[in-house]
């Protein structure tokens, strides 16, 4: 009989401004060292700048940006007969959103603007127009998936 306690997933509350789970999750990815209030300020500032520049609803903008970046497949490696194959696997919506948010946050830190707020604004605007490093990362993943389509029937 197992003595381990059952693991319950932590519930992430919706963000206070838009009431959205997706935005609350995005703020959690931006957060560093537990400073959620600072992460919220950074995110809301960048969203307000983007909505002013593009003259659109900020919530719809975020959904479009995440849709542009999120992948449909993921690559898992499997060793069969002494060689390692990269097998493309279809992923669910939550996992693809996780990848898109992580890529946006990671690639915004690599940009050359001053301050993280401006870096995030630049990355989000470029992601809206499909010109960002995050969308390039998605395209590279899609190329690898196309090369390894023959192995998609393998089971993991």
From Swiss-Prot:
GO terms for cellular component: small ribosomal subunit. Belongs to the universal ribosomal protein uS7 family. It comes from the Bacteria. Gene3D superfamilies: Ribosomal protein S7 domain. The keyword Signal does not apply. Part of the 30S ribosomal subunit. Contacts proteins S9 and S11. This is Small ribosomal subunit protein uS7. The lineage of its organism: Bacteria, Pseudomonadati, Pseudomonadota, Gammaproteobacteria, Oceanospirillales. Transmembrane segments: none annotated. One of the primary rRNA binding proteins, it binds directly to 16S rRNA where it nucleates assembly of the head domain of the 30S subunit. Is located at the subunit interface close to the decoding center, probably blocks exit of the E-site tRNA.
């Amino acid at each position: 009989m197992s003595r381990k306690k059952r693991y319950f997933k932590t519930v992430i509350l919706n963000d206070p401004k838009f009431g959205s789970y997706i935005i609350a999750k995005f703020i959690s990815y931006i957060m560093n060292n537990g400073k959620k209030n600072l992460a919220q300020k950074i995110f809301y500032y960048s969203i307000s700048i983007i909505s002013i520049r593009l003259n659109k609803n900020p919530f719809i903008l975020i959904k479009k940006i995440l849709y542009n970046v999120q992948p449909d497949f993921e690559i898992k490696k499997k060793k069969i007969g002494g060689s390692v194959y990269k097998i493309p696997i279809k992923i669910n919506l939550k996992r693809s959103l996780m990848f898109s948010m992580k890529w946006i946050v990671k690639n915004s830190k690599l940009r050359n603007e001053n301050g993280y707020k401006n870096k995030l604004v630049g990355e989000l605007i470029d992601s809206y127009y499909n010109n960002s490093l995050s969308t390039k990362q998605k395209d590279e993943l899609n190329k690898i998936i196309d090369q390894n389509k023959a192995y998609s029937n393998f089971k993991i």
